[in-house]
Amino acid sequence: LWSDIDMIIPVPLHWTRQWKRGYNQAEVIARAAAEALGVPVRTDILMRKRRTKTQIKLDIKEKAQNVAGAFAVTEDARAIFRNGGTVRHIVLLDDVFTTGSTLGACFRALRSVFPPTVRISVVTLGYVER
């Protein structure tokens, strides 16, 4: 899992939620992991393009619907390939895993730009059984 990592991408918050909270907990965790591993954190690759409801009280189907299409890759992600860059391994990081809806939506957005030859690993700090 930890070999050949090119970047760690934290699951982004919508800018209004991050502004209100003052930080993104996934980014805080990602920065600590990145420092330990000596790899960059890229907050410029994946964006939350619309606000979503908090997922805490939603059931599995509602969670999937809530985040469907909420994430997109940025122009910076597309530029990596246009400029001849190579990426072998991305770590997508979130603070907690419950149903996988958020991470799945992020994965699909990343896969729309990064080909199957790029490994995308998912890491979370915690798991909540529902």
Functional labels for PLM-detected ranges:
Residues L1-V91, T99-R130:
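Conserved PRPP/pyrophosphate-binding segment of the phosphoribosyltransferase/PRPP-pathway fold
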